[in-house]
Design a protein with these regions (language model features):
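Short, basic/glycine-rich phosphate-binding loops at helix/coil junctions
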Residues: 15-18, 101-115
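Loop-to-helix element that buttresses phosphate recognition and phosphoryl-transfer chemistry
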Residues: 9-60, 115-129
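Generic enzyme active-site microenvironment
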Residues: 5, 76, 147
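Phosphate-coordination/substrate-recognition cap region in phosphate-metabolizing enzymes
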Residues: 37-103
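Active-site-adjacent alpha-helix immediately C-terminal to a catalytic or transition-state-stabilizing loop
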Residues: 11-12, 59, 67, 129-148
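Extreme N-terminal starter segment of soluble prokaryotic enzymes
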Residues: 1-3, 49
């Protein structure tokens, strides 16, 4: 079984800022509690591997979860956060006021997304599918956590 786990609450979430791949964005205290809860829930699943995005907030989530699962995590660039281009570190409200709902535009393949340097849905889909294929081939019949 492949379990996708989003990183726990991070500083940018509480500030309503789109962090993208920005380094140095850490979990909040609440985020650390959330990661602990996730780790406790995963304890019973006999997790054999944890792969994580290389961004700080995902690594911090993985560090906490991995202690509960007794498995060391490995970083993998195929799980990295969406590259948000020019929208990186912008407040959500400003993005929506100037560009509308960029998330819907991302999924629909709008050219406005790529024109602003945002990674396309197809690009994200390709790298995540590569990761899933890797996990299926390497961890047959095992429980694996992918932290994004």
């Amino acid at each position: 079984m492949i379990i996708f786990l989003r990183h726990a609450q991070a500083e940018n979430n509480t500030k309503k800022i789109l962090a993208g791949r920005t380094p140095g964005i850490n979990l909040t205290e609440e985020g650390r509690k959330q990661a602990e809860q996730a780790g406790k829930m995963l304890e019973a699943l006999d997790v054999s591997a944890i792969y994580t995005s290389p961004i700080d907030r995902a690594i911090q989530t993985s560090e906490i979860v991995s202690k509960h699962c007794n498995v060391e995590y490995k970083t993998d660039n195929r799980l990295i956060e969406l590259d948000m281009g020019q929208f990186t570190m912008m407040p959500y409200q400003e993005i929506f006021e100037k560009h509308g709902n960029v998330f819907l535009k991302f999924y629909s393949g709008s050219s406005e997304v790529s024109e602003n340097g945002v990674e396309t849905f197809a690009q994200v889909q390709n790298r995540v599918n590569e990761m899933v294929d890797f996990v299926i081939s390497k961890h047959k019949n095992e429980n694996v956590v992918l932290v994004t």
